[in-house]
Regions:
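Amphipathic alpha-helical "stalk" segments
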Residues: 1-91
Length: 91
């Protein structure tokens, strides 16, 4: 079940790669952020906006998270996810 959850989580984050033509504030993009937050809360821990914002920062920071997300979602997916999450959490 853990591997299944990890794959599902990566698929949710990687989906931001296919949304890069949209604005991070677009309702469809923001709905994807909500799905991500709900999934983390359901399967891992209570994902507050503060925690989600920190995750978004890690996704776009250029390390292993960024590389894995971009490998799954395409170039720029991690940075776009960071922008979308920041918009969701900070307005």
């Amino acid at each position: 079940a853990q591997q299944e959850n990890a794959r599902a989580l990566m698929a949710l984050v990687a989906a931001f790669g296919h949304m890069q033509t949209k604005d991070p504030a677009d309702p469809a993009v923001q709905a994807q952020v909500q799905k991500l937050q709900a999934f983390i809360t359901e399967h891992y821990y209570t994902c507050t906006k503060e925690i989600l914002h920190s995750l978004g920062q890690m996704y776009g920071a250029g390390g292993e998270f960024t590389a894995n997300i971009n490998a799954a979602g395409g170039p720029g997916a991690a940075e776009f996810a960071r922008k979308a999450i920041e918009r969701y959490c900070c307005g």
